[in-house]
Every structure is written in structure tokens, then in C-alpha cells.
């Protein structure tokens, strides 16, 4: 109130007082997000002595959020494995489903972390987008940075920027198209936040259900998610040094 933090909730306001309200947008967005259906058992896609991959359902956050009561894959996985250590090296957006990889011992962290930071692994996604893709394949390349918060939920938004951005490279291949939609495969050569979502929307092909980047609200209301799925990952194994997909 009048430039000072108010500590007494019962204090009376005087006429002409200036009131500034602080809003925690992260907590607000988390509270407004739909509550996901929590699976009884997480599906394990791959497991050996060093690595384990889970199939993350859409709607389930990768890790704990500001809403401590909201379920997340990391905590569910720990519980399912009986408290075994899990090293988290990447994440998927809440509404993105698919492959999520963890290390099972700390001694494998450096080897795996370097592959992520140096972009030495390949991550493949399937996306359903609005519109008919004209080119059967191509490469999308730009520098991505934050554009601030957008929409009624004040979600963090990213896009191509002229300065201060990080290089992002996405290859795509058209799999099928019809009824005003296209099914495509995307391969990431970098791992920037919202990279595929931004690159496709900037080409005029927003992911179906992705209201933050241009998909009509009716699609999200109908589907309850955006149509992006991480279907494969190729990584060099920390023990055998062979490629594992």
C-alpha cells in the first residue's frame, strides 16, 4: 500500500491509497491446470542397470511444481521403484506425453548429462498440427528466447528473437495429411523450451490443442491436451558405449 508491503490484513484503507497486488503467476498457472488422472502403475519402456525410461502420460508434470499436492511423474516413479535413486536429465511439458529418461545411479550422471548439454543424442516427436504442410520435409532453425507471459493463465511464452536467444534446430518430415491437419515427425537437434511448439507455430502450423501458440480453444476443450508425443530417443549407453533407442 503506497509503495510499502502491507503486513496487517485488517488495516483500513484511506481514500486515495495506491494498492499494488503481487501475483505469483507460477502458482496461479499450476492451480488453474486441470488435475491429471494418475496411473496406478507407470509404464516402463526400457530398463537396465544404468538407465530407465518411463512413458509419461499427458497432463502429468515431469517433476514437483509449486503446487505441492499435484502429482508428478518423478515422485510417482520413485514410489513405484521403492525409493530407488533417479537422476532427472530432461523434462517434457505437462501436456506432452512420451519417453522420459532417468539414470539409476549417480555415477552415470555426468556421461548422460553431457549428451544432453552437447546435443549428442536424438529425440524424436510426433505432432498433429493445423493446416496442410506443403513441403514433405525440412529444417527449422532460429534463435529462441522468452517473450514474457501470455494468455489468461499468464503462461511463459517463447519465440524467435533478434538478440539474446539460444540456437534451436528442428528437422521435420510429413507423415500424413488430410481434413485440414498434418501428422509430422520432428527430430530435435537442440532442446530449447517449447522448441517444437514454437517452430511449428511460427510456420503457421500450431500443434492441435496448443492454445498458447495459436490452436483454437475448442480443440483443447475437446482433447484436454496438445497433440505432441515424444516417441523415441537415441542415446549412447554409459556402460556399453553403444547407441540405444
Residue ranges and their predicted role:
Residues 1-245:
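RNA pseudouridine synthases
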Amino acid at each position: 500500500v503506497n509503495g510499502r508491503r502491507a503486513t496487517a490484513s485488517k488495516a483500513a484503507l484511506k481514500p486515495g491509497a495506491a494498492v499494488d497486488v503481487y501475483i505469483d503467476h507460477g502458482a496461479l498457472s499450476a492451480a488453474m491446470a486441470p488435475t491429471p488422472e494418475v496411473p496406478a502403475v507407470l509404464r516402463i519402456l526400457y530398463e537396465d542397470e544404468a538407465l530407465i525410461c518411463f512413458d509419461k502420460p499427458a497432463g502429468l508434470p515431469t517433476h514437483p511444481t509449486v503446487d505441492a499436492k499435484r502429482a508428478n511423474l518423478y515422485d510417482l516413479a520413485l514410489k513405484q521403484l521403492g525409493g530407488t535413486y533417479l537422476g532427472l536429465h530432461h523434462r517434457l511439458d505437462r501436456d506432452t506425453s512420451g519417453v522420459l529418461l532417468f539414470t539409476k545411479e549417480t555415477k552415470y550422471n555426468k556421461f548422460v548429462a553431457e549428451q544432453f548439454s552437447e546435443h549428442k543424442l536424438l529425440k524424436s516427436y510426433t505432432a498433429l498440427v493445423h493446416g496442410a504442410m506443403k513441403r514433405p520435409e525440412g529444417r527449422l532453425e532460429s534463435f529462441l528466447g522468452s517473450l514474457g507471459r501470455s494468455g489468461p493463465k499468464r503462461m511463459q511464452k517463447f519465440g524467435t528473437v533478434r538478440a539474446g536467444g539460444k540456437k534451436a534446430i528442428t528437422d521435420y518430415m510429413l507423415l500424413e495429411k488430410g481434413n485440414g491437419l498434418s501428422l509430422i515427425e520432428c527430430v530435435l537437434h537442440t532442446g530449447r523450451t517449447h522448441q517444437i511448439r514454437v517452430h511449428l507455430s511460427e510456420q503457421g502450423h500450431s500443434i492441435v490443442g496448443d492454445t498458447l501458440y495459436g490452436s483454437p480453444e475448442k480443440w483443447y476443450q475437446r482433447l484436454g491436451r496438445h497433440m505432441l508425443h515424444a516417441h523415441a530417443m537415441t542415446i549412447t549407453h554409459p556402460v556399453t558405449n553403444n547407441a540405444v533407442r
